Amino acid sequence: MASTSNTFPPSQSNSSNNLPTSRHASIVEMLSTPPLLPHVQVNDTDDKEQPEESTPPTATAAAPGPGCAATPAPLRDEKPQFKLSAVPMTQTPSQCLSCVHAQKWQHIPLSQLIEQNKLIFVPGSISVEEAFNTLIKYHLNSIPVESFPGDMNCFTFDYNDLNSYLLLVLNKITVSNKQLTADCQNGKPVPVGEMVKLTPKNPFYKLPENESLSTVMGILGSGVHRVAITNEEMTKVKGILSQRRLIKYLWDNARSFTSLEPLLNSSLQDLHIGVLNIQSKPTSRQSRVISIQGEEPLIMGLYKMHVERISSIAVIDKQGNLLGNISVTDVKHVTRTSQYPLLHKTCRHFISVILNSRGLETGKDSFPIFHVYPSSSLARTLAKLVATKSHRLWIVQPPESSTSASSTNLTAANTAANAVSATAQSSANGATPMSKSSSSTSLNSHSPLMTAMEDPPSPRSSAIAIPPPSPASSTNTPNLFEKEYRTGKLIGVVSLTDIINLLARKQTGNKEVDPQSARRQRGSIAM
């Protein structure tokens, strides 16, 4: 086992055109509104998606080009409301869209969204370790596995397969293929083509590049994670369109798609997406809220994701408050033998390891926010999904609503910035499990991700109320972690599938698409 595991590797400039505004954009504005569209021509810029591990671009000023956008109406999240045109944002790579497509996003051909230069296949004969190395090298989340060159019905290898492989190596799961099990546990190379057959998957959906977004919405809105885009003759795969790339494209170009505005202005509660009561049984169209206690070992979290066929899991405390998020892609942090002890430490501890790792990689503290509130607008939710590159966000009860019957409006820019700054300073003083990373890296308490992704906290929020800890109390890591990172009681979840399904039902002909059909096809395992 050791020999097999040791083969895994360790893991803009501002626009010169400034908007004529007399004030700085607030955090709420930046997060709740899509980027401005500069004057571009079709195929002016390469539509390249950022690598999976890269930091989202800094929000900088960029003036809209002539004729690209009429004066847009405001998008709503928290009060007060702001006009779209008030927010200076930078151009994003996906904005290669001509204004002729305004209000007609359903008719855009799929050829606009594919990345031909990023299409990579691997043969099924290579080992799981080599396939994993390819994911890391090219910053991918999945990769097609060919049985032969030009295979049009191939499987895909992703981090769910890697998680299954790790659990098989550790003898935590069993499969019918006894030879493959023996090879895994004896440290022999295992062909990736055999491994991908063990994890239930959806069919390899294919659509020609001349099909429209309206067509693909019906497939991705059913819970299928990715679709292959072929040439018009359907004889060659030209690209892969994932749920996440589709959402990023729609968000980056939302100013051109004015028909989306009423939905973007609406709250999750009003749109009836996401499970908003963890105690009640979800409907057939809703995702279940799947979580794990922070004190449970990491290996149980990985096992639970494998059994439930999910790509991330919420970590909660004993009172049901959200502590953090563990994604199946985080399995890359435990693929070497030297990292195996982490598997038997708590999920709470692993979250701190992930944060430390991000700090070392990016040179600054990183604390992505994976939660929204029932009152959060769809616009804010999309912005967070794009910025965190995640497939789902956890819906939490606002902190003050669980302790006081009198609700207070959430404060905006200056309060949020002060809260983030205070939290970052507390981290630098050794208040959180991130402190070791903080002391050895450059602290940037006003980094774009930290400030733009922070929901404005309430006056009762623990991020504001906690004073710097005394040296005597700084060793009490669990309590400090719970106070510093708790965001509210977990009451629901909203996923990319939920949002794409909503758009498909509301604005395309796919009125009856079921967001849970693909997951039911993949199935959960009863062990």
Curated annotation (Swiss-Prot):
Belongs to the SDS23 family. This is Protein SDS24. The keyword Cytoplasm applies. GO terms for molecular function: protein serine/threonine phosphatase inhibitor activity. SMART domains: CBS (SM00116). Present with 2840 molecules/cell in log phase SD medium. The lineage of its organism: Eukaryota, Fungi, Dikarya, Ascomycota, Saccharomycotina. Residues 1-75, 424-478, 508-527 are annotated as: Disordered.
